[in-house]
């Protein structure tokens, strides 16, 4: 499809004027179950409230008492871990709260009317705000007011992070996080204003309606700020405790916050330079042909055995991997130098320490961990679709997501949103439908190599002209505060922008100096996706799978969207995917001279032609759908930074269980779907998928008693499901010895299996793209998303069979392909692991005094406000916000 980068939208005028739907009379505000199809439950730990006054902060320091509704959903969330093995349908309500529209009169905790036409009602049990507006703008105002009530200080942190100004706001320890944001989403105020003023898709009329929503939302935030400055019971105590200044909000703050979350959860690709460095290292060691073949095995771009959400084929960027057309690989033997972002820092310690900015930066680096599972009506016990849905956004105190319910002309929705962009529910339910997402990580980011000219690293050649790069500067200054003792200092963040995007590094291509530039389709267009979220909240845009897909297609960030109502289910992969210049490589940098631009590229408006609607992976009423950030569909190439889509993925853990549940004509209940998710949430993928083949490979050589005893422990762990959990709550995992062996063995195993052939330098190069998946340097919960498990398995399968494995490597690594030599290699690596003590594996950070897996793996909540300190919860590899849904009736 040819058209602008941000596809055209055709929203009926009736939708824009919000007159197409009936809503309950304003006098009936809060009526329980009004316009509700029934069957909705959810949980969002730790709790709804994020407001802590100075007095509450001091009370917590004195006696550890939380403000009300700060942590009352955590017991539900944690409790499912222990109930999961024997979960029944009647127990689901014990672990997911009622998410029905409205509040029963007997359950109303508070009613606030911040202005005429706006009513906000909260329930006694969990304090979730229900916002009712007489007009659409009243509803948006209420959303802003309620959001500020629950997350004002966090919203301030987020807008400053989005603007790369967090160091100036909260201290110099945040400077690295600011530099990361500035390198990825550097915007001037003019840029942010333009995002809402001059949309690249749809009519100006519909964007006027959207802009009115944003402005009313900001008005609501500012109304709360104004009131809080007069009423200390509404003012977050962090402002006083940290000496931070509270300023009014602007619409540009909403755009800056959107750029932050879009950059963390809604992008994929952009690692072309790293990939190029790896292929160069392999070429140097094995020669060009063999080196590239080995690179392809690790790359796993389109492994034929990779699990997918939909079975159909949706071909995208499969060809031309090593095309020489415009190819800009760094010259062999040369280095690529990262661009310097931080300049003029007056204190080295400003780069140290932990901060909220660091936490969000880590989410960007860690990858994505959401999952959802949907069963079609013909496969469920109640004859209606069943869904367990949720995004994983990490764990924070207070949570970086918040829940709200919105009602007004044309709007009925409840669910989770990111504070600061919460004018709409982003993940949740409507009248008689629910939707959710996982990060897809599909390729919407490329790298162009700008050929430098004019004897300067800040000039580049484009379409025959030598152009100046645009210099973008963010000045920073900070003082020490109660949370960050970094000495006072100042610095400048500097990036350079070309027509393609932001400069990330410098290198040499064919002897010419180049600047490598990140080109992201959503850059300068963060606002474009708002249209899709707006539609999700409007029942007349979400009545059918077709309408849902059209709504989801307006979201330019890369997400796997799931939908279900009382009859149907659907899936759609959203995202703005560029049509690359014909014949160019989608895997490596290409020259930015203008000849190899994206098709239809308009440098002035930063638009181009996009992949058409029907070309995106999608399906309707598929019997079973699972997404755990896995590959969307066959022949949909993994993004250049995604090397983990091998012959199995963690989504198999859930899908295998559900396939067994519905096999032979059987049907699944809601509890069984919840159980499949939760049982998988504590499994170690290595135990479930790799160890059985490892044991088989080790049998080619006799085992001594020490090895045999270790293997016996591991086998018993595998037979029990390979879980990392403590069901009896004694503080020690079941099969703890086996888990300790596995964690100590894994890095030694991979080193022994691959390093003799690859060499240490090449192994480290590959690990810069995809790490082993072993125990990390600091206590952390394992996600089992990306690691070397499929590499190890496919290599061992080749050794055992003596035959190439489809999608695998061109050579055998373990023991050079000899069964006995491989077995000895594996056994020797296991022996070496048995000499490692738990203290050597886990005795760091928070686990110095408790060096064991159950300590190391805990879900540790990062603090985003001052009332509390870091908390640790039992490990679950599970979504943060989660819905359990089976819609009871169709209201259409």
Regions found by a protein language model. Name each.
Residues 28-691, 703, 716-892:
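C-terminal/peripheral segments of proteins
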């Amino acid at each position: 499809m040819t058209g602008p980068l941000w596809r055209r939208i055709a929203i009926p005028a009736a939708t824009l004027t919000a007159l197409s739907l009936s809503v309950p009379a304003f006098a009936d505000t809060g009526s329980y179950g009004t316009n509700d199809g029934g069957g909705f439950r959810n949980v969002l730990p730790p709790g709804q409230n994020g407001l802590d006054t100075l007095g509450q902060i001091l009370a917590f320091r004195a006696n550890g008492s939380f403000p009300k509704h700060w942590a009352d959903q955590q017991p539900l969330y944690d409790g499912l871990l222990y109930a999961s093995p024997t979960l029944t349908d009647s127990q689901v309500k014990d672990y997911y709260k009622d998410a029905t529209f409205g509040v029963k009169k007997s359950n109303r905790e508070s009613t606030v009317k911040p202005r005429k036409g706006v009513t906000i009602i909260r329930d006694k049990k969990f304090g979730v705000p229900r916002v009712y507006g007489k007009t659409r703008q009243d509803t948006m105002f209420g959303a802003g007011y309620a959001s500020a009530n629950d997350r004002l200080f966090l919203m301030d942190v987020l807008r400053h992070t989005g603007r790369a100004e967090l160091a100036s706001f909260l201290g110099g320890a945040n400077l690295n996080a600011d530099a990361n944001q500035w390198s990825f989403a550097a915007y001037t105020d003019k840029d942010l204003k333009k995002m809402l003023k001059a949309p690249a898709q749809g009519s100006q009329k519909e964007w006027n309606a959207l802009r009115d929503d944003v402005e009313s939302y900001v008005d609501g935030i500012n109304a709360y700020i104004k009131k809080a400055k007069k009423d200390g019971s509404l003012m977050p105590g962090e402002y006083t405790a940290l000496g931070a200044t509270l300023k009014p909000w602007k619409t540009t703050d909403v755009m800056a916050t959107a750029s932050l979350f879009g950059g963390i959860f809604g992008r994929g690709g952009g690692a072309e330079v790293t990939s190029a460095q790896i292929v160069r290292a392999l070429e140097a060691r094995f020669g060009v042909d063999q080196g590239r073949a080995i690179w392809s095995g690790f790359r796993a771009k389109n492994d034929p055995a990779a699990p997918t959400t939909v079975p159909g084929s949706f071909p995208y960027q499969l060809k031309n991997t090593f095309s020489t057309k415009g190819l800009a690989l760094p010259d062999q033997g040369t280095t690529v130098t990262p661009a310097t972002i931080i300049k003029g820092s007056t204190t080295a310690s400003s780069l140290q320490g932990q901060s909220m900015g660091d936490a969000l930066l880590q989410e960007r680096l860690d990858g994505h961990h959401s999952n959802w599972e949907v069963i079609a009506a013909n496969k469920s016990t109640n004859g209606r679709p069943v869904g367990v849905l949720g995004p994983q956004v990490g764990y924070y105190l207070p949570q970086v997501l918040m829940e709200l319910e919105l009602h007004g002309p044309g709007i009925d929705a409840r669910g989770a949103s990111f504070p600061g962009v919460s004018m709409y529910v982003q993940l949740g339910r409507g009248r008689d439908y629910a939707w959710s997402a996982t990060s897809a990580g599909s390729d919407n980011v490329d790298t162009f190599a700008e050929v430098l000219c004019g004897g300067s690293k800040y000039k580049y050649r484009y379409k025959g002209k030598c152009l100046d790069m645009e210099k973008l500067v963010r000045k920073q200054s900070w003082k020490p505060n109660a949370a960050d003792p970094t000495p006072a200092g100042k610095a400048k963040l500097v990036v350079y922008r070309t027509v393609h995007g932001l400069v990330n590094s410098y290198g040499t291509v064919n002897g010419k100096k180049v600047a490598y530039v990140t080109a992201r389709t959503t850059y300068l267009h963060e606002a474009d996706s708002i249209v899709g979220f707006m539609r999700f909240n409007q029942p007349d845009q979400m009545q059918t799978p077709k309408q849902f897909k059209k709504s989801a297609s307006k979201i330019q960030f890369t997400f796997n969207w799931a939908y279900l109502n009382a009859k149907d289910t659907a899936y759609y992969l959203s995202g703005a995917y560029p049509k690359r210049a014909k014949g160019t490589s989608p895997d490596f940098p290409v020259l930015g001279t203008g000849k190899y631009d994206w098709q239809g590229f308009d440098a002035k408006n930063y638009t181009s032609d996009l992949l058409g609607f029907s070309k995106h992976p999608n399906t309707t009423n598929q019997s079973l759908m699972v997404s755990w950030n896995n590959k969307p569909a066959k022949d949909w190439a993994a993004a250049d930074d995604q090397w983990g889509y091998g012959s199995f993925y963690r989504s198999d853990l859930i899908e295998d269980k559900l396939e067994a549940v519905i096999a032979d004509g059987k049907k699944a209940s809601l509890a069984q779907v919840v159980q499949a998710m939760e049982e998988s949430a504590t499994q170690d993928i290595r135990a479930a998928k790799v160890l059985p083949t490892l044991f088989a490979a080790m049998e080619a050589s006799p085992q001594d008693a020490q090895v045999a005893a270790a293997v016996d422990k591991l086998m018993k762990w595998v037979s029990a499901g390979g879980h990392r959990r403590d069901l009896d709550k004694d503080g020690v995992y079941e099969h703890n010895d086996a888990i300790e062996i596995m964690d100590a063995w894994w890095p030694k195993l991979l080193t022994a299996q691959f390093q003799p052939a690859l060499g240490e330098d090449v192994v480290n190069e590959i690990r810069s793209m995809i790490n082993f998946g072993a125990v990390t340097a600091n206590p952390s919960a394992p996600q089992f998303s990306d690691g070397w498990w499929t590499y190890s398995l496919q290599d061992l399968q080749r050794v055992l069979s003596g035959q190439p494995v489809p999608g695998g490597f061109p050579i055998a690594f373990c023991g050079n392909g000899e069964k006995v030599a491989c077995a000895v290699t594996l056994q020797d690596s296991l022996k070496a692991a048995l000499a490692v003590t738990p203290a050597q594996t886990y005795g760091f950070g928070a686990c110095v005094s408790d060096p064991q897996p159950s300590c190391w793996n805990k879900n540790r909540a990062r603090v985003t406000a001052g009332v509390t300190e870091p908390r640790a919860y039992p490990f679950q590899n599970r979504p943060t916000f989660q819905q359990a849904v089976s819609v009871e009736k169709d209201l259409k």
